[in-house]
Amino acid sequence: MMNMNKLFKRIALAVTLLTAAALAPAEETDICSPFRDGKVDESLLATMLSAADDGHLFRIQQQSSMVGFCVDSKLSRIEGIFREFKGGMAFDSEENGTGQTMVLIKADSLDTEGNMVESMIKGESFFDVEHYPEVLFTSNGFHWTGADTAVLKGDLTLRGITKPVVFTVTLTALDDNQVKDAQKILVKATTTINRADFGMKKLTTLVNNDVQLCMSVEALKYGS
């Protein structure tokens, strides 16, 4: 049974959200709004809301963050970044296995250095943004490997195909606190996927199969 202190905290959070709703757009006050409508399991949303309640939720700040990829080709190294994405990270800095991360990317916001390359990557041979407008990552395991390093396991959904991935993560406090007490953090995460696993099986003689995914995101503790 929920103790009284926990109940009062949830009531206070609800009052705060209702007050903010009168001053800001609905999407800004609903911390899980980008992930509703069946995008993720309701239990994951509950975890994020509980983390907000407990003070363990960090929201990604899009303007000061980067989400992208790089892949080698016969001609050059192809690098791309996504301009539109939302998400958050919920974790207890002193416990393993209690974290949850969700990131939703607008595939059509992809930006590369050249229009021809960008059109190719957005096209049906690769991201096929017309039919698959979003890329989704949801985690199912977070394990600290050091004071500021961790492993993040989860599922990546790309082109309608979901596969497990493992990110190597480094966290840095962006204030005068340690990571565990920080109000704002920098999270860098990388992993490598095989594009063929996600249905990108064309142009294999031109573009490598291995694609590195990378994130460098600033995240602000919810309520700060």
Residue ranges and their predicted role:
Residues 19-21:
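N-terminal signal peptide c-region/cleavage motif recognized by signal peptidases
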Residues 25-224:
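Low-complexity, acidic/polar, glycine-enriched regions of mature
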Residues 3-12:
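Bacterial N-terminal signal peptides that target proteins for export
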